Amino acid sequence: MWLLRPAGSNFIVALIVLACAGPLTCSAQLDAGILNPWGSAGHNDAVMPGMFANSESDERFYSPHCSSRGLPLVNESMASVIFFLSLAMVCVAIVAILYNCCFNSFKNSVINSRW
């Protein structure tokens, strides 16, 4: 059972950190009022090229009821740093587990083969 090895426990710890960091990032954004794609809650704070600066086009582009609340890449907050660090830890853990499985499989096949 490769889940019981140290690499598996690192993967489980990384998943727990990621699960804890997810709600923290969402609550930090809601507290800061970051609701639209440009990183602010107000209308007409920033306009994309080609977009009109009137409220009618803003309402068509952005609705607070059906918009996703993802991580803004332009605003560096502590919550997004924690999220991306935990995401990197999960990726490293997955690569380590896959490498460990492939290495053990190769080692077992070489030992079991007859020369």
From Swiss-Prot:
Location in the cell: Virion membrane; Host membrane; Host Golgi apparatus, Host trans-Golgi network
Membrane topology per record: Single-pass type I membrane protein
InterPro entries: GN_domain, HSV_GN
Keywords recorded for this protein, A-Z: Disulfide bond, Host Golgi apparatus, Host membrane, Membrane, Signal, Transmembrane, Transmembrane helix, Viral envelope protein, Virion
Gene Ontology CC annotation, any one: host cell membrane
Signal peptide location: 1-27
Membrane keyword on record: yes
Residue ranges that the UniProt entry lists as topological domain Intravirion: 99-115
Domain of life: Viruses
Virion surface side, ranges: 28-77
Membrane spanning residue stretches: 78-98
Family, similarity comment: Belongs to the herpesviridae glycoprotein N family.
Primary role: Envelope glycoprotein necessary for proper maturation of gM and modulation of its membrane fusion activity. Also plays a critical role in virion morphogenesis.
Subunit and partners: Interacts (via N-terminus) with gM (via N-terminus). The gM-gN heterodimer forms the gCII complex.
Name the UniProt record assigns to this protein: Envelope glycoprotein N
Organism whose genome encodes this protein: Psittacid herpesvirus 1 (isolate Amazon parrot/-/97-0001/1997)
Gene name as annotated: gN
